[in-house]
């Protein structure tokens, strides 16, 4: 396949050379079946050209055979075809990963599913919990030391061994919880004790059997038997019932009413003390003001003092009448605790001792007699009401 020298286009190549480059498609042979996708063509070598030919770069490019038309292409494509067929067979069997699906999609999803399945949570009485747990430093050291002594290669086996060895304690806790629930429900103590005994005996028997099995297992493996579990030195106190509050009886109600009456009396007494102290302060202030304005030799000073005393007595009479109409009674003898220096406080004390109008008449007569005389320089003179 050598073109003419300096040929401008491939169309100037002779026909037999063009047929050599692109041969016609032959008919399939029914007698000989070939397994490859390409057929071998038996052709004679081209005759040598009668004209001289010179090599050129364009001719070399055109003369280079195409990879698709190379007769040994079957040998190059056959391994790749076998790989595709094997991948398809693996994909049909469920073990293939590259069976026509990109790795970036299903590979990442499969890896995520595997990671999620490894750390899946479990449903417990307290909700969803993770299967992994974090141990403290001391517990982790003891745990792995026990695992090394037992010769286990997985932590779950060590935990299973611990659960098997503590069956008796677990059953005891379950029986205690059942008895506490029965007590909270209000059942009798005998039934609770009976149930507890019924639960505890099989637990002890089961625990003994478990300990025996564990000891036998330890002896068979050449390991030390586990020590029996000691009884608790300080048993748990029984739980208090929800309805353990005592019901109040008649005696407690009567005591409560008595305490309420005492509080009411104390409140009334403090009210009278406050009133007496206010009146005493007011009377002392008025007396001091009157003493500054007038000399002590003037008899009108005593008149002012007596008039203020009469005013205080009138106010107390009005207050006592209103108290008597309202039904407020003050017990006699309580106001004796009040110590006052003025006449107003003396009037309050007399009113508290009497508690009514009839008992306070003698006190008013005594006050009237004291008002009729006044003292000057250690000498008591009779007070004249008509003195101006």
UniProtKB/Swiss-Prot annotation:
Plants over-expressing TB1 exhibit markedly reduced lateral branching, but normal propagation of axillary buds. This is Transcription factor TB1. One of its GO terms (biological process) is regulation of shoot system development. Expressed in the axillary bud of the first formed leaf node. Expressed in axillary buds, shoot apical meristem, young leaves, vascular tissues and the tips of crown roots. Residues 187-201 have a biased composition (Polar residues). Its main location: nucleus. The lineage of its organism: Eukaryota, Viridiplantae, Streptophyta, Embryophyta, Tracheophyta. Interacts with MADS57. The gene is TB1. Keywords: DNA-binding, Growth regulation, Nucleus, Transcription, Transcription regulation. It is found in: Nucleus. Disruption phenotype: Increased lateral branching. InterPro entries: CYC/TB1_R_domain (IPR017888), TF_TCP_subgr (IPR017887), Transcription_factor_TCP (IPR005333).
